[in-house]
């Protein structure tokens, strides 16, 4: 029984299947963790969703910003952009089934035995684990309800960018969504910066990567995340695992076998352009 953590798939179905064959992943025996952004940019978003859904209890995933954007397109709120290559999925006969399944997936995964936490963008240093759990449940409850289009219409935006337990309503939900799915840099007090997308070395002072600011979750748990392809899996502290290595941009799809911390890599079938990845 092994646990495999894989970074952002972004519709790269062929690379996903090749990587799973490489590690000899066995559904029903092994467990697959996915950091979110299953869809968009790669050519196989439909096949990725069908396959991941078919895994049932053998998969644990979190939603990413591109997954949420897909749901907004599906709900008629956002425009379907050709570069996202989502049309085959949106026009598929099982689109309703797949996307209603997708919107019921979580923002946060926790394994207490492994002391492992996973979220698409990471965990803001302003939260302890109990707060992160409660915040994830708040958004998950709205997404799985009949009123989810109303939330998706209001989720776009960069403010508020500072956590307070007093946040209420759509502002609270927007902050939670941004923290779980869009965060990269923070100010020293943990306040989110939603504008900078440079590499950590090029970010203006006083910004730091979220994982460089001490927080209560990282003191007790390992954290796995995706979202930040331009990191190329490098530069994180011990116990923080950056798994998005830009497969859809011509990088690679990366897998971490949790039990022995061994990495496996499947090169992308596309030309490398991590500069575009930094802007996504």
From Swiss-Prot:
GO terms for molecular function: bis(5'-nucleosyl)-tetraphosphatase (symmetrical) activity. It is an enzyme of class 3 (hydrolase). SUPFAM superfamilies: Metallo-dependent phosphatases (SSF56300). Keywords: Hydrolase. It catalyses: P(1),P(4)-bis(5'-adenosyl) tetraphosphate + H2O = 2 ADP + 2 H(+). Its EC number is 3.6.1.41. Belongs to the Ap4A hydrolase family. Hydrolyzes diadenosine 5',5'''-P1,P4-tetraphosphate to yield ADP. This is Bis(5'-nucleosyl)-tetraphosphatase, symmetrical. It comes from Shigella flexneri.
